[in-house]
């Protein structure tokens, strides 16, 4: 965050003589779908479909390139069921299992808990639990920025802003299988990790 460096390595960092593999990551999910009787102040009558992972972006400390893993990256699974996130979840599980430290913005409250929920759903044993650094918590605890939103922090610290999405339509387009939407989602997800 903001020019703070953890050292130079290909995918690990030396901390007091120990080598730590540090993973920066972010996930994007599809929304829950439900039946409702109205638009405002409504209870869900029945849930139609639960959320799932659309994609995740990641970069190892010391690497320049941020990668994105998404549902269409697994065409055999995706063509059979475009909502089946088993391959994406499995790829994320492997990274978590390899990492000593994971870094995400609001990762403790959202990304890690959502990831753990999908690991459990797919009967994956918990990965070797890495140490977590939540940059939102770090910003709140050690600094007094006007805003702790990732895009605002990135802009304030000269790292850039979040990628514009155009709103919910980007997520809806991905759920419909629209290739342009998937390109936009990957660009959006990549930028979130680049801001970390």
Segments (PLM) and residue ranges:
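Acidic two-metal-ion nuclease catalytic site recognized across multiple nuclease folds
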Residues: 2-10, 14, 187-196
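Short, motif-level signal for alpha-helix interfacial/capping segments enriched in acidic residues
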Residues: 4-7, 110-113, 170-171
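Conserved RNase H-like, two-metal-ion catalytic cores of nucleic-acid enzymes
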Residues: 4, 11-97
């Amino acid at each position: 965050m903001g020019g703070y460096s953890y050292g130079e390595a290909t995918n690990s960092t030396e901390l007091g003589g120990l080598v730590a593999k540090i993973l920066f990551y972010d996930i994007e999910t599809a929304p829950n779908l439900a039946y409702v009787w109205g638009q405002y102040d409504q209870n869900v009558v029945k849930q139609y479909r639960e959320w799932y992972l659309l994609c995740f972006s990641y970069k190892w400390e010391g690497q320049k390139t941020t990668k994105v893993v998404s549902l269409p990256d697994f065409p055999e699974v995706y063509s059979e069921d475009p909502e089946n996130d088993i391959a994406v979840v499995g790829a994320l599980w492997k990274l978590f299992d390899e990492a000593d430290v994971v870094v995400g913005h609001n990762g403790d409250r959202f990304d890690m808990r959502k990831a753990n929920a999908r690991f459990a759903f797919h009967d994956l044993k918990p990965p070797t639990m890495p140490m977590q650094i939540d940059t939102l918590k770090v910003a709140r605890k050690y600094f007094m920025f006007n805003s702790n939103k990732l895009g605002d922090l990135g802009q304030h610290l000269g790292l850039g802003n979040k990628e514009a999405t155009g709103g919910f339509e980007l997520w809806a387009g991905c759920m419909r299988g629209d290739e342009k939407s998937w390109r936009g989602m990957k660009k959006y997800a990549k930028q979130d990790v680049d801001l970390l």
